[in-house]
Structures are given as C-alpha cells and as structure tokens.
C-alpha cells in the first residue's frame, strides 16, 4: 500500500526525467573510437560536446521537480565510467522556470530584443 502517492509519483517523475536527460545527451554526443592504424590511434565519431559549459532545462518534469539540477547533471560525462564519451565534465545549469523558451524562439522572428529579454527573465541559475 502506498501511503503518500503524491511523494511516490514525484520520485517516479524525477527518476524518469533523470533517465531522459542522460539518454538524450548520450544520443546526441559523439565518442572516441580507438583504432590501430599507422596514421592515428583514435577517431572522433559524432559531435564533440566537451566544450559546452551551459545546460538549460525546460519542460514540466524539470520545472516541477524539487531538484532539477540532479536531472540535468545527467548530461555530464563520468570520466571513470565513460572516458570516451564527448560530453562536458562540468557545466552551469539553468532552468526555463516559466517554460517560455519555445515561445521566445518564435518571438525572435518578430523582435530579437524582446525575445532575448523574455528568455533572460525566465532563465534561473540552479545552485
């Protein structure tokens, strides 16, 4: 019997968000493939995201999370477990607290300055 279903549901949603962030980051990042050749010993396959230093989270599961940073940290590579993945090792994390980035992207076509102001007002740096 679940005593506090709202707490249980919150934990489930946060676990799903963490998993989604982790999987999606790895889907988009490249990796190093070790090869044995006279010309090289390693090849980069895919995008090198190691120099990405800012991660922005948006969407209901992150906005409503009690700890959105924990989910967003899923984009970071673990140098021990994933030495060849081309993801950042550290980053600053922001939350689209008002869930308006999508609208600001559309607004940009009408007025760049207003769109930028909307985005800046919505982004909250996570500790």
Task: Annotate each language-model stretch with its function.
Residues 3-127:
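Helical "lid/coupling" subdomains associated with nucleotide-phosphate turnover
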